[in-house]
């Protein structure tokens, strides 16, 4: 117990958040690298990202199409989604990412792991979402540590825009959760506020959470935990 306390993070609410000694995806044998640097920031408003991505051949990607569907928006490296796909084989997962090299590597890792319930798609989600899913297709959505785009004139580049919220209200089944995380308080609060402005979303917890209810950190989340930095989390639901 003492070791756990020493490795804990003090949350803004004063509760100690325990963290494991190593990330849960650390043992995944992922061999393929990128071979080159990938830009950390991509402007989603550039013309090259304004064409909707064609949906994948779902029946080729997922072995069991009837399982509930989890959409991870801005999936980054994909390690979080690969790990949760291993732990929850009764769910199907799609990670959407605007940096193509990361998508290609994540799908290569998926193939190494032999997973048939997870796929990664190169797309601008704000352009492609309605072309990928039909109403009621989604059962869970995560938006974890999106690019904060700090400058005010760049806020229109942020992922969570009113139209995205309206689209998710249509595509999510009633009772489905939307999990939001950021290490930037203003970004997390803005995301939550955008969803709560829509009449189809509500906050059953009436405020931020102290811990990640999914139990698997992203790489950015893990870095924040190691540095004892605060993380702002909201678990909202579709009415």
From Swiss-Prot:
Catalyzed reaction equations: guanosine(46) in tRNA + S-adenosyl-L-methionine = N(7)-methylguanosine(46) in tRNA + S-adenosyl-L-homocysteine
Binding positions (substrate): 151, 183
Gene Ontology MF: a single term: tRNA (guanine(46)-N7)-methyltransferase activity
Polar residues: compositionally biased ranges: 1-13
Family stated for the protein in its record: Belongs to the class I-like SAM-binding methyltransferase superfamily. TrmB family.
Domain of life: Bacteria
Enzyme class: transferase
UniProt entry tagged with the keyword Transmembrane helix: no
Positions contributing to S-adenosyl-L-methionine binding: 72, 97, 124, 147
Region Disordered: start-end pairs: 1-30
Documented EC number(s): 2.1.1.33
Function: Catalyzes the formation of N(7)-methylguanine at position 46 (m7G46) in tRNA.
PROSITE patterns (alphabetical): SAM_MT_TRMB
Pathway(s) annotated for this protein in UniProt: tRNA modification; N(7)-methylguanine-tRNA biosynthesis
Keywords associated with the record: Methyltransferase, S-adenosyl-L-methionine, Transferase, tRNA processing
HAMAP family assigned: tRNA_methyltr_TrmB (MF_01057)
Protein's recorded name: tRNA (guanine-N(7)-)-methyltransferase
Pfam families (alphabetical): Methyltransf_4
Cross-referenced InterPro entries: SAM-dependent_MTases_sf, tRNA_(Gua-N-7)_MeTrfase_Trmb, tRNA_methyltr_TrmB_bact
GO cellular component: tRNA methyltransferase complex
């Amino acid at each position: 117990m003492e070791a756990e306390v020493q490795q804990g993070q003090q949350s803004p609410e004063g509760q100690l958040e325990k963290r494991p000694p190593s990330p849960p995806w650390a043992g995944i044998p992922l061999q393929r690298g990128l071979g080159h640097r990938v830009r950390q920031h991509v402007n989603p408003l550039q013309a090259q990202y304004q064409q909707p991505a064609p949906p994948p051949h779902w029946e080729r990607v997922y072995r069991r199409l009837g399982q509930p569907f989890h959409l991870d928006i801005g999936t980054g490296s994909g390690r979080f989604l690969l790990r949760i796909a291993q732990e929850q084989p009764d769910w199907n997962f799609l990670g959407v990412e605007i940096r193509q090299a990361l998508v290609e590597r994540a799908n290569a890792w998926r193939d190494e792991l032999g997973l048939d319930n997870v796929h990664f798609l190169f797309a601008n989600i704000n352009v492609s979402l309605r072309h990928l899913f039909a109403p009621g297709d989604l059962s869970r959505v995560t938006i974890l540590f999106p690019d904060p785009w700090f400058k005010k004139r760049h806020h229109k580049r942020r992922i969570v825009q009113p139209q995205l919220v309206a689209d998710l209200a249509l595509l999510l089944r009633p009772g489905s959760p939307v999990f939001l995380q950021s290490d930037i308080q203003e970004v997390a609060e803005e995301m939550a506020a955008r969803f709560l402005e829509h009449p189809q979303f509500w906050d059953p917890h009436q405020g931020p959470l102290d811990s990640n209810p999914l139990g698997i950190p992203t790489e950015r989340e893990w870095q924040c935990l190691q540095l004892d930095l605060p993380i702002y989390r909201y678990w909202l639901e579709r009415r």
